[in-house]
A protein has these predicted regions:
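Helix-to-loop junction immediately C-terminal to a conserved catalytic motif
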Residues: 47
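Conserved ABC ATPase "signature" region
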Residues: 93, 104-119, 141
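Catalytic Walker B motif of ABC-type/P-loop ATPase nucleotide-binding domains
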Residues: 148-152
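Helix N-cap at the start of a conserved alpha-helix in ABC-type nucleotide-binding domains
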Residues: 159-161
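Conserved H-loop
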Residues: 184-190
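Conserved beta-strand-loop-alpha-helix hinge in the C-terminal portion
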Residues: 202-227
Length: 242
């Protein structure tokens, strides 16, 4: 399991505030929250891209700066960069080389699954955003890393590809775990058993019904202020119309 203890991150303000949480094996955990709430910073700290101001992150006895930890985690960031000078296949081979249990013999099958067979040997500079996202998902799955962490993994995917990826993640839960940031209600509804809400620097389990999640987010101070503005604007517009 991934264990986070007393994680804090300070920039000019406190972004993450003493977060302690455990992500068990063989489940999909979904993190939701408004923009700027610290979700991306949280995952960046977990995988070691950013150093926390305080706190520790472990998988079993392996610290997140250790090689054994890194071999067990695959991270799909929201603002990923893929090298334009590589083909899709070259990139997959390059990434999977650092994972000792990677399924290299399944690469062709997954390019076909994600409708990228014809693009396999084309340069990544010719790929659309959605195609690049598919390549990242293929790499994550074929890495056989026990933990896949993803920031808005489903952005840029069409509805069919989203459903295929959901089914794929579900099929892998016997030996894989996923921690995903998402605002996509399709994803939240599919994986509604393990939802975490990021708000005011805290990450807490959401125990209500998924239908209550929207109301919970709307109670966030910055969102509430925006809703108040909308209501005032609508009232003003009605008065002008009269």
């Amino acid at each position: 399991m991934i264990k986070i203890e007393h994680l804090s991150k300070i920039y000019k303000r406190l972004v993450l505030n003493d977060i302690s949480v455990t992500f068990p094996e063989r489940q999909v955990s979904v993190i939701v929250g408004i923009n700027g709430s610290g979700k991306t910073t949280f995952l960046d700290c977990v995988v070691g891209l950013k150093r926390p101001s305080e706190g520790e992150i472990w998988i079993d006895s392996h610290h997140n700066q250790s090689d054994p930890f890194k071999e067990q985690v695959f991270y799909i960031p929201s603002d990923f960069y893929l090298p334009d000078y590589m083909t899709g296949n070259e990139y997959i081979q390059f990434v999977l080389a650092r994972y000792p249990n990677a399924d290299l013999d399944k690469v062709d099958s997954f390019f076909e699954l994600y409708d990228l067979k014809e693009a396999k040997n084309q340069l990544l500079e010719s790929y659309s955003f959605g195609m690049k996202k598919k390549v990242q998902i293929i790499a994550a799955v074929l890495s056989n890393a026990p933990y896949v962490l993803g920031d808005e993994v489903f952005n840029g995917l069409d509805f069919e590809t989203t459903l295929i990826t959901v089914k794929l993640f579900q099929a892998l839960l016997d030996h894989r775990s996923f921690v995903l940031i998402s605002h996509n209600m399709t994803i939240i509804n599919h994986f509604c058993d393990h939802i975490f809400l990021m708000s005011n620097g805290k990450l807490v389990p959401f125990t209500g019904d998924v239908s209550q999640l929207e109301a919970e987010v709307l109670r966030t101070e910055s969102v509430h202020d925006k809703i108040t503005f909308i209501q005032r604007y609508a009232t003003f517009d009605d008065n002008v119309s009269e």
